[in-house]
Amino acid sequence: DNLARGRFILGVSPGALRSDAEALGILDEDRNQIFAEAIDVILAIWAGETPYDIDFENNRFKVTTAETRYLDVGYGIMPKTFQQPRPEIVGTVVAPFSRGVIAMGERDFHPLSANFLLPKWAATHWGNYAEGKANVGEVADPADWRIARTIFVADDDATAKAYGKDDTNSPYRFYYSQILKKMIRGNRQGVFK
């Protein structure tokens, strides 16, 4: 945020890749809960001062620099963000009726609905975001909701048709076949129905 002089947007997600969770040894844990715990600590670091001493109840992440802090050389100090009180935080959303979007609204994070979702599923995110904002006495602003879309502009119709539909080796077809395989393996193919 400091390098970008306030033009930084923090993109976050609890992550849906089971392989990442397995590699980290958290395959059977509630990754949404771990994500919430991590975000709480990040926000506390940005709002706090050294030595931080962050120790939230029911949160696995504890942060302190009390023993190693050496202010004369900058040890134990985490810089404040350029944007105050913090940069904009945008969270990706895939699941229809995602409960995570409620938490985004409650924390004033902004949702980004995935590019491959059918419109009927992306539309379910708005109601949950508005519910989250209402939970903290605020009104949701549609300008805070982003919907990703994949757009390809070709030199002519034939190229566009080949890229999007006819050529089985096109990057577009490859991307969606990979997404579909991942969703089927994770039993989440409902996003395509």
Residue map of PLM features:
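Structural preference for beta-strand elements that scaffold enzyme active sites
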Residues: 7-11, 88-90, 110-112, 142-148
